[in-house]
């Protein structure tokens, strides 16, 4: 019996016969691989001094830019869905799915850095002279990602000029300007949080109930501290309770909160912060499950961008040290290190929510009125 997988000269080879009569494109045409795979122009090769690792350098950065394009595509679709007065649960599920996709892409980008680190500093030096004045600072797509996410111009670290001035192309500058004007993910999430059901003073009034719970919690802490037999320990506990009281005052007093926003220490409006805290407390409720996932994914995105920046900083220090200027004229390592601060963390308030937690048993219970309202599928 002949092997069904083995061909012979007498059999008709139908491997090239189309499986469909529909008009379409073959794999290479559809992906435009002729353009994609012909876009690696090694300047060292043009100079008749080819450096092997320049090819890796180009491929890695092109891969970054392709993934940046996909992140922008996802962010734009998410922003479109959030830019509505009412968002039903099916939309929330889709937003969560796409944010999760961005998280996985960013994890991949973080993991790409070690591949570039297989190149030694001497290997990099062999072709670094060809890179000037090019610089990662000139990545238009990364700047668009930052702006669409919600990095504010006034929060940026300046190195020797405004970040948008590195782009000589007017079309690129227009893209930057438009991304600064358009509602960012931060702004749209803030609007969405401000509509959290249960914040209404005429309804459940979560914020008033939360303040009452905090007051009772701190009063119980004071009573417990007063029973401490050791004077020094008692004073220490009372001092710690007063510090916590001041922390809570920073969210309960709108004037204090607004001052922190002006200073750049907070990002959300006062009401949006209330919504985020409420979702965090009641995340086990079916209605708040997806919103809580959404907030968690936003923190994941912030964290992964920070990790990517950190890995980039370490790689730059390893390749060129901490004193040399970058190829684009920036302060290189020093500038990149400065971007690791909280000023570049867009959803900083979400990271700090744990500061305001109270024990589970102290969380105000939901009444029947709010439970019925939470059955409504839209916010």
Swiss-Prot record:
Gene3D superfamilies: 1.10.287.3810, 1.20.58.480
Binding site for substrate: 57-61, 128, 327
Cofactor note: Binds 1 heme group per subunit.
Cited SUPFAM superfamilies: Indolic compounds 2,3-dioxygenase-like
Residues annotated for heme binding in this entry: 312
Domain of life per record: Eukaryota
Pathway: Amino-acid degradation; L-tryptophan degradation via kynurenine pathway; L-kynurenine from L-tryptophan: step 1/2; Pigment biosynthesis; ommochrome biosynthesis
GO molecular function: heme binding; metal ion binding; tryptophan 2,3-dioxygenase activity
Oxidoreductase found in the keyword field: yes
Pfam families assigned to the protein according to its UniProt record, in alphabetical order: Trp_dioxygenase
EC number(s) given by UniProt: 1.13.11.11
Cofactor(s) essential for the protein: heme
Enzyme class: oxidoreductase
Reactions catalysed according to its record: L-tryptophan + O2 = N-formyl-L-kynurenine
Keyword terms of this UniProt record: Dioxygenase, Heme, Iron, Metal-binding, Oxidoreductase, Tryptophan catabolism
GO biological process: L-tryptophan catabolic process to acetyl-CoA; L-tryptophan catabolic process to kynurenine; ommochrome biosynthetic process; protein homotetramerization
Task of the protein: Heme-dependent dioxygenase that catalyzes the oxidative cleavage of the L-tryptophan (L-Trp) pyrrole ring and converts L-tryptophan to N-formyl-L-kynurenine. Catalyzes the oxidative cleavage of the indole moiety.
Family statement: Belongs to the tryptophan 2,3-dioxygenase family.
Cross-referenced HAMAP family: T23O
Subunit comment: Homotetramer. Dimer of dimers.
Name of the protein this chain belongs to: Tryptophan 2,3-dioxygenase
